[in-house]
From Swiss-Prot:
Native source species: Caulobacter vibrioides (strain ATCC 19089 / CIP 103742 / CB 15) (Caulobacter crescentus)
Transmembrane regions: 6-29, 189-212
Gene Ontology CC annotation, any one: plasma membrane
Region (Disordered): 634-657
Protein name: Chemoreceptor McpA
Domain Methyl-accepting transducer: 354-583
Function per UniProt: Chemotactic-signal transducers respond to changes in the concentration of attractants and repellents in the environment, transduce a signal from the outside to the inside of the cell, and facilitate sensory adaptation through the variation of the level of methylation. Attractants increase the level of methylation while repellents decrease the level of methylation.
Origin organism lineage: Bacteria, Pseudomonadati, Pseudomonadota, Alphaproteobacteria, Caulobacterales
One Gene Ontology molecular-function label: transmembrane signaling receptor activity
Amino acid sequence: MKRIRLVDLPLIIKIGFAPAFALLMLAVMAGGAILVQKSQSAALKQVVERDMRQNLEIQRISKRISNINGELFVVMTHKAGNIDVDKNDARMAAVLVETDAVKKDLLALKSKLPAEEQPKIAELIKSLEECRSAIDTVSGMISVDFNMAAGFIAPFEEQYVKMTGQLDQVVAAANQRIESESAKRQAQATAAMSVTIIMSLLTLGAVGALAFLTVMTTRKSINDIAAATDKLSKGDNSIDLEKMTRGDELGGIVTALKVFRDNQVHLEQLRADQEKSAALTADERRSKEAAAAAAAQEASLVVSNLAEGLEKLASGDLTFRVTADFPGDYRKLKDDFNAAMGSLQETMKVIAASTDGLSTGADEIAHASDDLSRRTEQQAASLEETAAALDELTATVRRTAAGARQASDVVSTTRGEATHSGQVVHQAVSAMGEIEKSSGQISQIIGVIDEIAFQTNLLALNAGVEAARAGEAGRGFAVVAQEVRALAQRSAEAAKEIKALISSSTQQVSQGVSLVGQTGEALQRIVTKVGEIDALVTEIAASAAEQATGLNEVNTAVNQMDQVTQQNAAMVEQSTAATHSLKGETAELVRLMARFQVGSGSSSYARPAVADAGHHAPARNPVAEQQARLNTFARPGRSSGSAALAQAPASDGWEEF
C-alpha cells in the first residue's frame, strides 16, 4: 500500500485543516461552556426558586404553629384572670381556623418536597390533627369547667413539642439538600473550568503548530521551485528534480521543469552532434550545418520563449503564456509549459481563495470568541445579581431570627409578670386570711358588747324597781334608769345586726379566700406553661439562627460560583487574544500570497489583508466555499453544479451558535 505523504495532499486540504480544526475545537469548547452554564443556572434557579422557598415556607409554618400555641395560652390566661372573657370564643374559633389553614399549607408543601421527605410531613400533619382535636376539646370545655379544660392542655403541649422536633428535622434535611447541591455544582464548575483551560491550550498549540508547518512547508516548496527555475533559465541542467516530485498542485510545475530540462539536455546533445559534423564533407557539412542552424534557430526560439516564461514564473507572474509558434516536436513542450502555467495559476487562485476563507474564518472565530466572552460576562453578572438576592434573603432570615429572639424576650417578660401576679395573688390570699381572722375577733368583741348591753339592761331594770320603791324621791332616778335601759336595748339590737353582718362578711371572705386560692393555683399553672413556651421560643430562635448560618454558607457557595464564572470569563478573553493572534498569522500568509499575479479577480483575494477586523462579513462556512471552488477548478465542464455548490454555504451559517 502506497504511503501518503504530506506533500502529496492538495493545498486546499493542508491550508484548510488548521482553521477547520480550530473551528471544531472552538465549537466543542463553546458548546461545553454553554451546557455547563445552563446546568449551573438551572441548579441555582432550583435552589433559589424551589429549595429556598420551601425552606422559608417551613419556617413560616413553624412560626404559625408557635403563634397558635401562644394564642391558646393567651386565651387560658385571660380566662383565668377574667380579662376580655367575651372575646375568648372568637379567639378560639380563630385558632381552629388557623390550624386548618396550616394543615392545608402542609398538604400543599408535601406534594412539592422530595419523596424521602414526604413521610416527615405526613407525621407532622398527623400530629397537627391531634393538636386540632385537643384544641377543639379545650374550646368546648373552657366556658363550662376551666380547671378541666386546663387539664387538656397537657396533650396539646406534648403534640406541640413533637411537631417542633419534626419541623426541625424537615428544616435540617432541606438545608442539607441545599448544601449538597451547592457543593456538587461547585465541583462541576471547577472541573469544567479545568477541562476548558486544558482544551484551549492544546487547541492553541495544535492550531499554531499546524499553521506554522503549513506556511513554512509551502513557502519552502515555492522557494525551491523558484530556485530550480532560475537555475534552468541560466542553463544549469544538473539540478535533481526527482527530489522535488510531489502530488499536489505544485507538482505540475515540477513536471513542466522536468520537460524543460530534458529539452535542454537534448539541445546540448544537438550541439555536440553539430561539432562532430565538422569532420564530414563540405556538402554534408553544409547540409548538416544548415539543418543544425535551423535546429539551433528553432531551439533558440524555444529557449528564449521558455526563458522568458521561467523569468515571469520566477517573478511571480502566472498569467504569462508562450504564444510563439514552436516547430515540430517543440509544440508539445509549448503546450505542456502553458498547461503547467495554467494549472499553477488555477492552483494559486485556489490557494489565494483558501487564504481568503482562512482569513474570513479567523474573523468569524474572533467574532465567536468575542460573543462567547460577552455571554460569559453576562452570566457572571447574572450570578452576581443572584448572590445579591441571596444576601437579601439571608438578611431576611437573620431578621426573622432577631424577631424570634425578641419573642423569646417578650415571653420571658410575660413569665416574670405572671410570676409576679402569682405572688400578688398569694399576698391577697394572706390578706384575706388576716381579714377573716380580724372578722372573728370583731365577732368576739360584738359578743362582749351584747353581753354588756344585756347586763346594763338588767341593771337598769333593777334600778327602776328600786326607784319605784323609793317613791317620789326616786322618780328622777327612775327616768334615768328608763333611758339607760332603752340605750342598752338599742345597743343590743345594734350589736346583733353588726354580728349578723360580720358573720355574712366572714362567710364571703372565706369564699373569696377559696376563689383567690384557686386563681393562684391557675396562675401557677400558667407560669409553668409560660416557662415551657419560653423554652420552645428559645429553641425556635436557635433554629432560626442555624438557618441563617446555613443560608450564609449557601451564599458563600454562590459567591464561589461567581468567582469561577469570572475565571471562565478571563480564560475566554485569553482564548480571544489567541484567536486574534491567529488572525494576524493569516494576514501574513495573505501578504505572502499577494506576490503572485494570478489574473482577473486576484485583487479580491488580497482584500482580507487590509480589511477592518471590527467589521464582520455575513457569516458563512469558508471551508465549504473553498471546496466548492476546488470542485469548479477540477470539473470545469459542470459550471451549473459548481455554482450550486458555491451558493450552498450561504445556508450553513453558524452565527447563531
